[in-house]
Amino acid sequence: MIKDVENANAEFYDAFENVSINMMENIWIHNDNCICIHPGWEMIVGWLAIRESWMTIFTNMKNFKFTITNTKTRLYEDVVGVLTCVENIQMIQNERKVHTGVVATNIFEYDYNQKRWLIVYHHGSPVSDYLPPANSY
């Protein structure tokens, strides 16, 4: 089951890299209880507001490339999966290549109707004094 949570996490970052709101919609739970905290943003509550935040991000930033490191995954009662990781990100922002690091916590809930893990919480915090890992890009 841990591998299933890690696969759901990979789907989340695939959606990000592909700048795909459709893929992002597929991995998030659609209710008013989900939460997203992007680095430097206020807390966003509810799927519709979270969807709008992804639309804004996808409009302003392109060509995301993620290298995920330092992954730690835990399961609670086979219903909740918590994954922490470092997002090593390369992107194009305002015509410039940018490298940044974000420590992320992604919480997944098992959806028995869909028989899969869906993200219910994402929190990203910037890494100060970030140095990308060797060979990450």
Predicted regions and their residues:
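A beta-strand edge to alpha-helix "cap/lid" segment located at domain peripheries
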Residues: 1-26, 33-137
